[in-house]
Amino acid sequence: MTSDAAAPAASASFSDQAARLRDGARAAWRKRWVRWLAILLSIPVILYFVLWLLFARGLPSAETLLTYQPPLPTTVRDINGEPVQSFARERRVELSYEEFPQQLVDAFTSAEDKTFFTHGGLDYPGFVKAVINYTLHIGSGDRVAGGSTITQQVAKNLLVGNEYSVTRKIKEAFLARRIEHVLTKQQILELYLNQIFLGRNAYGVQAASRAYFDKDVSQLTLPEFAYLAILPKAPNNYDPETRTERALARRNYVLREMEKNGKISAAQRAEAEAAPLGTVRGPQNSVRNIGGYFMEELRRQLLDQYGEGTEKGPNGVYTGGLWIRSSIDVAKQRAAEQALRDGLMRYDGNRGWNDPGLKIDVAGDWRGALARAPFGVGYPDWRPAVVLAKSGGTARLGFTDGSQGDLPSYAAATPKRGTASPAFDFLTPGTLVAVKRNGADWQLKTIPTIRGAMVVEEVASGRILAMQGGWDLKGDDFNRATQALRQPGSTFKPIVYSAALDNGLTPASIIVDGPFCVWQGAGLGNKCFRNFSGPNAGPQTMRWGVEQSRNLMTVRTANQIGMDKVTRRAHDLGVGDYPNYLSMALGAGDTTALRMTNAFATLANQGRALKPSLIDYIEDRNGRVIYRADTRPCEGCNAPDWDGKPMPRPPLRTKQVVDPMTAYQMVHILEGVVQRGTAVVLRDLKRPLFGKTGTTSGPTNVWFIGGTPEIVAGVYMGFDHPRPMGGYAQGGTLAAPIFKQFALEAFKDMPAIPFRAPAGIRMVRIDRRSGQKVFGAWPTDDPKAAVIWEAFKPESEPRRAFGRDEEAQPAAAAKPAKRAARPQAQQPRDSDFLQNQGGIY
């Protein structure tokens, strides 16, 4: 047969076979069991596509997990790079899979998913069981757990959510299959161990290791790995403090599972079962939580810039994993906290016990209520406590860690403020108290009602090294360093005199310390300014007026040069914007401790403006710098190219707001305030210091601001709702000692560097009382010596001079002027403007 004839024959044979198959299929379909079998086989396929259409089509892509970034806390470090604070809603430290110890992986897979490394994302028997259990418990209110693999838990936690329903389980199943095709087993486990919530606000195994054992996960032991592995389903059910036996039983179950799965030997299991839980009390944090008010101000600034989460971008404060180098100096911060608290206690601590007025229910969870109460005790060795019971002469106290102690009546014998009865009589169950350890018992302490603030600033940069805005942030988050508007009193006077030095006056200029009144118009009469005490001194030098904080000399000077120049200088120094009223010259305008401290730091910086900053720079989670406080370019700042060349210097950071010679003259005058003026209490610090005291009318606030060429600190005290502090209260007696205590600690390792005069300043010997130039005599170390060095601008020094034999004349000449001053009783009484020394009306 030829090939041409064979082709039609083959075609006919194929057609016959197809026809026979069709006939066979028709015959088979006529049989009932074949039809039922086909229907049964098609149901799963149809069901799968229906489920896919209903649940899987709109699910998020598993590929997003390849670039998933978990919420990470913001870590704040101090000036030396040490961690001091963190901001987070979820405490988490991200680790790579290689950083997980193998026994940790074995413990979690044994407890949560024994077939994790072999299944394809689902444990089918467990999945079906979970769906059936859910169906059986519909309407019961019970939440049935089980059936979820680690992959499903990753899908639930990161993509689906925690809704309790069959639909969520089905979505989990679809996503688990997708995840297994996108990620490796190691990547899935890395996501899981970094994301899972394990109690004590710890997310991920590293944070949990710190929270429960106060060490890194790499340092844990086998029984500690097993304990962490029992926590994912219900951390509270295995709390090591309240449910110890249940936690031990479950931990030992995990150890037995590890042995059954061949991960550990019988000997290892037995040794681990014999070990206690070994957890620490309460959540532990790897950072030190230093500088409450400083960190709260820093947090506010970060929230303004970056937001809480992702609403302003990927660098949210609570989720972005920012790395912040702050300007806080821990040693100076602690010194500021201690000094301010001690100063508040010196004023208020001996006035009786102040009941904080806080109570909790001791019949319930008093530990949690005590921990949440807005009650800060300030000192590290004081503790907040609640009175649990009272019997006879003893009150039983409870503490946040669950421990208890006794407060005997003799340790609470201080009268309650406003009464003659001992504080012990007013203690009832539920009362919150501050106590300090006294041998085996405790002693009642009182929280002062007066408040204050302290700011410490670096002169060269404007960096804030320390900030204390009150007694304790926990009991009071109002930051008086930045938020409290207060009248600065006489600390404002250097602003007046610096403007005067720019407008023709010198430190030796003679200004009359005598009556000064301003006509206010018909029906209002005169407004007459007065000094706080003593007769008016007559003509005196500007220096003397600043050192003795004379109000009459200040308002006379402000009136002479024009208040517009004074308010312009206050604006340039960042103190505030004020109307051109003479009362502003005496500190009647509101400002903050931070602004005033920065103004004094600007003077110490030879008049160059400073921008107070709490942050040096910020890095995102990938180490990229996203903010830097100092943005100056530095041309040639490449070390290998320095050889044989001058050291490169970046441009100056800010503009000149006060003439450098004027700024130095003002600082030089303010050194006299410490040597022989209202801040003489600081003289025995025996180092170059400048500063100014302030006391406002009432007196309601007391101030001191000053420092060295390197550091300036400002402090004030006063009640939040202004009321008189008592006639003896002055900046020199209350605020300056706070600065002194701070300086003794903060400056002890700092060299005593003198203030540096700028180019053009001439240092001239003058008589400090008359302001006349002296020849034939020299200044001495005696702060009250007649002859001193004074700073003058070119061509401004006194022309007339007198010799050594005339040195005593100025003091004698001043006496008639003092006697000639008008007695206080004869001064005008119309709308008197009563002044405290260093104060306002």
Where are these regions (language model features)?
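N-terminal type II signal-anchor transmembrane helix
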Residues: M1-R77, T115
